């Protein structure tokens, strides 16, 4: 797959398509400060050449990158952290206190993913994560901040999608790097009369609907004007309406999970319920995308969301 150039989506913020599964599915970001630069998210191991190409494109030396920030440790966000850190000799890895240990020793993270996908598929999808030396890792608790040189970044604990999740606020652009806490919005769904379409993410294994509702409210309380999505890209304006749609999406997902009969067919029943809700939501939002194409675009998310809801039901004893 050819490497697309990094593109500036806001002053000093560059989007890099990580190439995960298909173009336009997963992004990471490069922030250029006055004194240094930082990556937000790494994507999977196979994305690292794209990040290094972006540095070369923008004339940024690897030694000038001071931080690599991962919002949480799912492999499509942080799987490449160790490989990227090897190429950035002066960088510090910033991770959630609950996730940092899995980047220092990714054995359990890798084993858990292999359990879901199988080893061959996991290697093809993500590549095997490389450990990061503990002395190069900093934990970012709620309220943590760092400065790239006239570019302060603030960190907020953001559970709900995962307990090891934070979001990063960029005051310079009044934007938030949301990881998966502000859902996903693919550009294939643009073009309708009601603006971007948002869909919630309930990836296994730590989905917590009450916590995710609270996280959405906390993000909105910061009054951001734009959100930098991993899945996918920059969305500006009307974030309160998008958050309201995500709140409804959380409740819809919970209803779909609870409506599924227990037993061997539960997963497919949950997935069928999510498909029906997705297509109804797209139609209600006025998205001009044929149903078959919509199911292709959201194929991976429907599967992962159904898996995550199954784990949530099991944890609740349902």
Q: What does each model-identified segment do?
A:
Residues 44-46, 64-76, 102-157, 163-228, 232-233:
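Metallo-beta-lactamase
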Residues 78-88:
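Metal-dependent catalytic neighborhoods of phosphoester/phosphodiester hydrolases
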């Amino acid at each position: 797959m050819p490497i697309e150039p990094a593109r500036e989506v806001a002053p000093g913020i560059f989007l890099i398509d990580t190439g995960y599964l298909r173009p336009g599915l997963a992004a990471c970001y490069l922030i250029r400060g006055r004194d240094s630069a930082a990556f937000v998210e790494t994507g999977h191991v196979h994305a690292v050449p794209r990040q290094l190409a972006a540095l070369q494109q923008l004339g940024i030396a690897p030694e000038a990158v001071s931080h690599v920030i991962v919002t949480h440790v799912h492999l499509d966000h942080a799987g490449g952290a160790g490989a990227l850190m090897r190429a950035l000799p002066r960088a510090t890895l910033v991770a959630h206190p609950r996730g940092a240990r899995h980047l220092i020793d990714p054995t359990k993270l890798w084993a858990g993913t292999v359990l879901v996908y199988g080893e061959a598929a996991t290697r093809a999808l993500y590549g095997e994560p490389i450990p990061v030396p503990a002395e190069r890792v900093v934990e970012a608790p709620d309220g943590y901040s760092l400065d790239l040189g006239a570019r302060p970044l603030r960190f907020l604990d953001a559970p709900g999608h995962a307990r090891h999740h934070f979001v990063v606020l960029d005051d310079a652009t009044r934007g938030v790097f949301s990881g998966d806490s502000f859902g996903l919005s693919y550009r294939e769904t643009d073009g309708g009369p009601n603006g971007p379409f948002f869909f919630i993410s309930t990836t296994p294994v730590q989905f917590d609907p009450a916590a995710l509702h609270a996280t959405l409210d906390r993000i909105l309380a910061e009054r951001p004007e734009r959100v930098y999505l991993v899945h996918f890209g920059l969305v500006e304006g009307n974030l309160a309406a998008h958050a309201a749609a995500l709140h409804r999406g959380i409740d819809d997902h919970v209803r779909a999970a609870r409506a599924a009969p227990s037993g061997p067919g539960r997963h497919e029943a949950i997935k069928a319920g999510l498909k029906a809700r997705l297509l109804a939501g797209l139609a209600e939002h006025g998205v001009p995308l044929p149903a078959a194409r919509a199911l292709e675009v959201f194929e991976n998310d429907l599967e992962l969301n159904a898996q995550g809801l199954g784990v949530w039901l099991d944890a609740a004893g349902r």
